[in-house]
Amino acid sequence: MFYKNEELVSILPLNIKKSFLKILNWNGFPFSDYNQPILKTNYHLKLNDFKFIISQLREIVKFDNIHFINNINSHYLDDTIKINNISYQLMFTRNEQQHNIIQKLKNKIKYEYRKLKINYNLEINLNPTKHEKKDILNFFITQKTKQLNRTNAWNYLNINKYKKNINNLLEYNNKNITFSCLKIENKIISAHIGYIYNNVFYYIFPVYDNDYKKYSPGNILLCKLLENCQTENFKSFDFTIGSEAYKRKLNNKSCEIIEYISSETILGYTYYFLIKLKI
């Protein structure tokens, strides 16, 4: 916590990751698509403030490196930064731009949507009950595990504490967490779990059953979510980080995501140069 003139103006949610060295980083991995300090309204953390906070931390705990990923701004950081990702948003303004973007997606999935409606009893649920939310969670864990294994990606769901964090979403504030799904014959074939905050819809955990990929169930559900956000006068639909093709097509705004790394010890320089070679 950072105070100025005896007033709390900023909280930095940090932790130290311990491996062969100690790394100061943001809390929330692997679920934090965006990272930044929590700031008092109208207060802006400056570089000198940040340096002072780090100097005070050094007096309390030792660490070899500072490594901040997924920073959505960098005004309080020095020039030891690297643009390493992009986030995309669809802003809902009063012009026709976002309407045209959504309409293009609607036209793209029109054939698959019609085939599903003809061949199956189709249901799209944007307001599930608690029991239905549990079904969505189970579907997400099952299908996400299959997807990560299929693509040889790191499966964070194999780690109990991360899997527990997903399951705990049922217990959090219903106003801020949103569940939705697409069903055929009462069977879920695509789902999404995300967040709503300050009238922004955050598209976080989309997943679909690969056996029904030819019907584009993920895109059909996404289209319904976009239409609903537009109808409900959301400020924006945030696709968060990632350079997937569909995000590049469905946005009217993008933001640079920053990675910051610095070394505090000789051992830390080894880590620093390894990361620099990687990025």
Language-model features, listed with the residues they occupy:
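A conserved beta-strand-loop-helix scaffold within acyl/acetyltransferase catalytic domains
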Residues: M1-L24, N71-Y76, I81-S87, E96-K214
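Aromatic (often tryptophan-rich) hydrophobic motifs at membrane interfaces
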Residues: Y3, S32, D49-K51, S55, ...
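Active-site/acyl-donor-binding loops of N-acyltransferases
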Residues: I16, I72-I102, T231-I279
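Cytochrome P450 substrate-recognition site 1
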Residues: L21-D33
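Short amphipathic alpha-helical segments
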Residues: D33-Q36, Y120-L122
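The substrate-binding groove and active-site-proximal loops of carbohydrate-active enzymes
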Residues: N35-H44
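Non-catalytic accessory segments adjacent to catalytic cores
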Residues: H44-T93
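Short catalytic-loop micro-motif centered on adjacent basic/acidic residues
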Residues: N65-H67, I124-N125, S236-D238
